[in-house]
Amino acid sequence: MRKLILAAASIAAWAVAGSASAQSPIVIKFSHVVASDTPKGKAADKFKELAEKYTNGKVKVEVYPNSTLYKDKEELEALQLGAVQMLAPSNSKFGPIGIKEFEVFDLPYILPDLKTLRKVTGGPLGGRLLKLLDSKGMTGLAYWDNGFKQMSANKKLIAPADYKGLKFRIQSSKVLEAQFRTLGAIPQVMAFSEVYQALQTGVVDGQENTWSNIYTQKMHEVQKYITTTNHGYIGYVVVVNKKFWDGLPADIRDELSKAMKEATEFGNSQSARENDDALEAIKKTGKSQILTLTPEQDEAMRKAMMPVYKEVASRVGQPLIDEFLKETGRSPIN
């Protein structure tokens, strides 16, 4: 796969050079792993629309949704090598390439709502996290929402004990590994595009995801129960190859930044509605029973997951966790 990515990067570099000399449009390949009708998919399409409009056709954005170009395990390497110019990976994806700080977003129950999230990502802390990406040959442009995660399986998930022994698909994140191990479950890292088949065939028993991801990937068709937990958050960081970005003419970069700002506002403004609509659509299919926890059951789940904070403190950074908790208004969790 690395050889294929290198070959693609060489072709992309040649194409960019050729385009520049012939005054053809600058091409931005924007790869992502979710469906076009998800919050991220719609934001990517909006960026394409605005980027091409504001640059008067000097930039052409090619959006590749649903892992049609690269799977989530491959896309960051493809970006670093220049085979694609832009991605919007989930926060979890940066840990495996050495930027573990982004895994703070994976901590269970660390974010009470999207308003609080905006305070973090739009403030100094969010800016510092984006700056960390420079060392990996990429520039962080924006934070995009998906939403809050729910748990699903073919058995009812009400109490912490219900998770024991079940195999759960996770993104590649040490925090998420710790989360499921704490519940007595077995975490299995798996590409997003492989989850439906893995659930269908029993390779894994359950998964965690947002309503929009569950619905657009049809996971509700192969899971008998979905429990409304809102225990964690899935968000994305829009990144661009740093060498490519820095090499753009200043006026083009300014117009693309403007397009990204507006696409971000557009996508984030409707992410909650997209998830609400997906939940209603799942209910209408009748293929998966939606379970709601009582306040007592919710509290039991929260307490069961709190040991994760201590377990990953040395990896994510206790000062960062403390600062994050202060920003979100949460009390330090012992």
Question: What is each residue range found by the language model?
Answer:
Residues Q23-T116, P124-N334:
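N-terminal secretory/targeting leader peptides
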Residues M1-L4:
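Positively charged n-region of N-terminal signal peptides that target proteins for export
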